[in-house]
């Protein structure tokens, strides 16, 4: 199972704070979350391809975490692209405990985001809490933005 270890992992990274106070709506795709918050729409990774069925340009941001990198395909990202407002951002936290694999997986996400039509693709260092080892692990976070005008 690439992209996740056998142990439980959770992320301390949260959805944008502007969504929790009612100013916008955020989408969170997470395999470890089963709660409801006002202003946040949760999806399981298995439902990621259905994001294209949601109202177009509804969400301000999307936060993806605890998802296998192989599930973050261009077709799934295209659905997310259509449901985001212009200049909406997507943040993908790579929860891979094997540090050597993180740059490879980040490049794979970057390529898939570019194929889906996103711009301003950036990778930066981040941390996540690995419940299996009970410690903070260093990882990478890939962010990208929906352009104001479609690329194609």
Residue positions per predicted region:
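Hydrophobic adenine-recognition pocket in adenosine-nucleotide-binding enzymes
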Residues: 67
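Conserved S-adenosyl-L-methionine
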Residues: 118-130
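Intrinsically disordered, Lys/Arg-rich low-complexity segments
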Residues: 2-15
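A short acidic, Gly/Pro-enriched loop at the edge of an enzyme's catalytic core
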Residues: 48-64
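Conserved class I S-adenosyl-L-methionine
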Residues: 91-115, 136
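A short glycine-rich, Lys/Arg-flanked "PGG" loop and its adjoining helix->strand segment in the class I
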Residues: 73-89
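Core SAM-dependent methyltransferase catalytic element
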Residues: 128-152
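Class I SAM-dependent methyltransferase SAM/SAH-binding core
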Residues: 13-53
